[in-house]
């Protein structure tokens, strides 16, 4: 197939994704139908009979779109935008859960205040009854007549041989009178302190909740990075060559020049946008949509190319030459 004249680029496909900003950034799956079919892919029929993307099938019937962030052109914003897109639904769910938990917490707080107030009222009544009993007991014991009756009762029990002779002695009576008060003052044997389960549960939620959220977000970002490995060449992708100059009109599109080499996402990563392909520049710094009739697919790549960027360790080593390190050590 011969390339179209470079001085007359074809008309752009309809930008159906302009009105679909609220959909996810990448919608997997493909639709098949008429429109912008190209039979320039080598190999067996992957998207249509007789050609990879050809055979008159093309990209048609797509109904997906992009969210309000879309695909930016800045190399530094790809990771943040990708992480935001992948984690937006999770954070909305977390926000709903937090709101529900806050409502339940407010309800439990109100219930706790009501129960605590009622409990304090009951405890106050019991305390007043206890004080009344103490006052009545002191009044009864203070009366001499009741003391004589008490002594007579103890003497009668001794006479009837129901108690030992020492039961009616003054020392025994004094001990029997003071024993209840000593028990109240000293108290019974203390039981071991129990575990404060509400406090333990609070610390588990306070510490484990943020950690769990961090783990979930990390897994989502990692999954998003796995999906975009094709942009850097670390995963299977298609290589395309630009046939015309294209200037992006919004953040969802990718600008490129005539003759520039692009990486096209595989089938499962392509969004459902009719007449457009998800592609990236050669270094993977920019990702966006490109018109399908402005590029020509060269072939499929399944192996990772050599790394074009230095790792953090290499950057550190290059920043400190060997002679500087040796001089510092000496």
From Swiss-Prot:
Q: Where in the cell is it found?
A: Peroxisome membrane
Enumerate the residue ranges of region (Disordered).
1-20
> What cellular-component terms does GO give this entry?
peroxisomal importomer complex; peroxisomal membrane
UniProt keyword Zinc, yes or no: no
Q: Where in the sequence does UniProt note compositional bias of the Pro residues kind?
A: 1-14
User: Member of which family?
Assistant: Belongs to the peroxin-13 family.
What protein am I looking at?
Peroxisomal membrane protein PEX13
Question: What species was this sequence derived from?
Answer: Caenorhabditis elegans
Whichever gene encodes this chain, its name is prx-13
């Amino acid at each position: 197939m011969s390339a179209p004249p470079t001085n007359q680029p074809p008309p752009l496909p309809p930008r159906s994704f302009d009105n679909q900003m609220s959909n996810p950034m990448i919608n997997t799956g493909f639709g098949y139908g008429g429109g912008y079919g190209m039979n320039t892919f080598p190999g067996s029929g992957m998207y249509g009979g007789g050609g990879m993307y050809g055979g008159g099938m093309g990209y048609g019937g797509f109904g997906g779109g992009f969210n309000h962030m879309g695909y930016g052109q800045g190399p530094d914003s790809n990771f943040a935008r990708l992480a935001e897109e992948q984690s937006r639904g999770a954070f909305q769910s977390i926000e709903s859960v937090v709101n529900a938990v806050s409502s339940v917490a407010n309800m439990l707080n109100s219930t706790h205040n009501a129960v605590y107030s009622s409990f304090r009222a009951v405890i106050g009544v019991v305390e007043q009854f206890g004080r009344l009993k103490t006052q009545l007991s002191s009044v009864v014991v203070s009366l001499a007549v009741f003391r004589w009756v008490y002594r007579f009762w103890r003497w009668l029990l001794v006479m009837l041989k129901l108690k030992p002779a020492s039961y009616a002695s003054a020392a025994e009576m004094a001990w029997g009178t003071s024993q209840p008060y000593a028990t109240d003052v000293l108290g019974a044997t203390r039981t071991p302190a129990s575990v404060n389960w509400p406090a333990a549960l609070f610390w588990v939620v306070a510490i484990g909740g943020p950690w769990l959220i961090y783990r979930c977000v990390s897994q989502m970002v990692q999954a998003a990075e796995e999906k975009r490995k094709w942009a850097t060449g670390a995963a299977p992708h298609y290589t395309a060559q630009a046939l015309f100059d294209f200037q992006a009109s919004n953040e969802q599109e990718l600008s490129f020049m005539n003759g520039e080499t692009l990486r096209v996402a595989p089938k499962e990563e392509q969004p459902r946008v009719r007449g457009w392909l998800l592609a990236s520049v050669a270094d993977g710094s920019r990702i966006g949509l490109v018109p399908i009739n402005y590029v020509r697919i060269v072939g499929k790549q399944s192996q990772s190319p050599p790394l074009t960027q230095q790792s953090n360790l290499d950057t550190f080593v290059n920043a400190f030459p060997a002679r500087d390190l040796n001089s510092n050590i000496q």
